[in-house]
């Protein structure tokens, strides 16, 4: 059965194991998620649970949103997401970090840091031209394509907005779970800036 929870990226730190191994970890704070809705094939056409994370002030919510969370007897939420293949939960139930344990393998999804408008070297890793000896080609994108189509093909690597994309990193290991602090320590780095929304789910392609 799939397990999943929403959390907030706190930052990175490092821990040492009992054997003295040094492990860089990302700290994810995941306060209890509340099940807001249970979707079924009969009513919605598919099966999933809808969870809310991070309370927000009622003055910032409209009446439909207040009515929706009232069914779960909870406060309005900043983030609402869905998880599939999760069973046995009812509206109003809480999902806490102790559903995971050290050694679990998970997929982590977040929004990558926005870098603004960048050129092809930073954005796509292209090589630059000579920087001296009369060269007039330094950090430009280069050829736009052959003459015969007389146009630029779609998906040509050019300058543009970089970052701010939905990114998933697969098969990351959970190093430690601290239930009393609602904290999960994940080995390595995860996408996103500090205080950004992070989704943690059971790994889809984990080695069996």
From Swiss-Prot:
GO molecular function: rRNA binding; structural constituent of ribosome
S-S bridge residues: none
Family listed: Belongs to the universal ribosomal protein uL3 family.
PANTHER family on file: 50S RIBOSOMAL PROTEIN L3, LARGE RIBOSOMAL SUBUNIT PROTEIN UL3C
Keywords: Ribonucleoprotein, Ribosomal protein, RNA-binding, rRNA-binding
PROSITE patterns, A to Z: RIBOSOMAL_L3 (PS00474)
Gene3D superfamilies, per the entry: 3.30.160.810, Translation factors
Function of the molecule: One of the primary rRNA binding proteins, it binds directly near the 3'-end of the 23S rRNA, where it nucleates assembly of the 50S subunit.
Subunit-structure text: Part of the 50S ribosomal subunit. Forms a cluster with proteins L14 and L19.
One Pfam family linked to the record: Ribosomal_L3
Record NCBIfam families: L3_bact
Name under which the protein is recorded: Large ribosomal subunit protein uL3
Organism field: Streptococcus equi subsp. equi (strain 4047)
One example of a Gene Ontology biological process annotation: translation
One Gene Ontology cellular component annotation held by this UniProt entry: cytosolic large ribosomal subunit
Region Disordered: start-end pairs: 117-149
